[in-house]
Amino acid sequence: MLDYALQAKIIKSSDGRLSDDNFTYKDWSLGIYDKARNMMTDPRLIYKKESYKRDSLDIFLRKINTYENYKKDSFIDFTDMIERSIDEVDFPPLEILILDEAQDFTPLQWSVIYKMCSKVKRIYLAGDDDQGIYKWNGADPKYFTTYFPGRKVILRKTRRFGEAIHHFSQIIRRGILDSVEKDYEALQKDGAVKRYLNFNEVPIGKLPGTWYILGRVNTTVNELRMCAKDAGLYYGDNRGNRSFDIKQWAAIKAWTKISKNKKINKKEAELMYKYIRELQDLSFRRDKFWHNLPDYQEYDFKGLKDWCGLDLPDESKDKPWWEILQRNFKPEQITYFIRLLKRYGARQLNAEPQIIIDTIHSVKGGEADNVLIYSKTNWPSAFRNKNISEKSDEKRVYYTGVTRAKNTLHILSTDYKYNYPIGSDYFVYLQEKK
């Protein structure tokens, strides 16, 4: 998609985001086009039904045409593969087919399932229509709850949370239209639901266990990440990215070994040199120099000076890493690493983070001991801007978010003009607790 955007000149090659390895190009019109394909409907009809339109109809159609012409040069996308599988794939016979998260399948994806089912003896569908939060991509929970035949079984007890979180989640669920009636019991365990007006009030790090810190849209997720970084928290996202540069962290660990009279391998030395200014010649930083050295060779401070062009005085060996790694390190990155090491220690920074900060959609299907939900949104996701059906869909999103929590649920409210009124849900919760 990024190559297409560059070729079609939708974004410029000078765009600063291109230097970010995590940057993913997304286009509103192409997203609506993909939704139409998943709904097996004319894109014009889907465009007209959208309450929020970022592009005119003319630009919308031109982007579709440009995208399809781009794909003619031997490119296919994921939706192409699904479409082609309906006509081209001969699915094998199966004894049992188990389909999880069935509420999130689109009509196009159901077409594939129907074809598979013709050769299946027994089929199990699992899902929750109240967590059907992919309508934006054409998903329709009714295929799961209504259209698909068979015996229905409703689970009577959650294995995740206690009464407090269960009660609060049901308050949100009351606003979901066409919800299949289902009563289930909570676990007999302690739990808590609390509300805050400031991120720094939330006891992140003080409560044991894992954390989900969740926002509705990427802009609010980025805001949460900045707050967490300012607080000196170690976190990641649901794609495995960490809150710091792992190459910088590897360089810190390499120099720490050197300063403790230990040796490092060739790979560690080569990476560390990317962050050291004091080299006899720039050639010692290039791949060509390291390529010619044996892989098994290890280096201490003296070896790096004698054979690898390190141009530091002997007394520098005992200096801390932040005085040596002065290249490709911003001051705020150095400060952040120092705070992390003081708070967590190297061993915890080598492990996966206990805190995940991401969108509600990204953690669907997951769970954490503690969950924080941020009510701030942007204009397209603002609750008050939506019609009755769209408000019901927003309720589904927040119901999904709060039911990720196992032990404690934390609500971060905002008076920003675009938001979900989770404070009102919390007020009802307090009134009903009395």
Model-derived segments and spans:
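Conserved helicase C-terminal RecA-like lobe
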Residues: 257-412
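Amphipathic alpha-helical "lid/sensor" segments that cap RecA-like P-loop NTPase cores
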Residues: 21-41, 208-231
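Flexible, charged surface loops at secondary-structure boundaries
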Residues: 90-94, 203-209, 403-404
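Short, charged/polar "capping" segments at the starts of alpha-helices
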Residues: 417-424
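Conserved helicase motor core of SF1/SF2 NTP-dependent helicases
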Residues: 96, 103-190, 212-227, 238-246, ...
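Accessory N-terminal region flanking or inserted into the helicase ATPase core
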Residues: 9-98, 107-112, 125, 135
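Conserved P-loop NTPase-based nucleic-acid remodeling module centered on helicase motor cores
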Residues: 1-28, 229-232, 236-244
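Helicase-core coupling region on the C-terminal RecA-like lobe
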Residues: 170-204, 214-231, 236-296
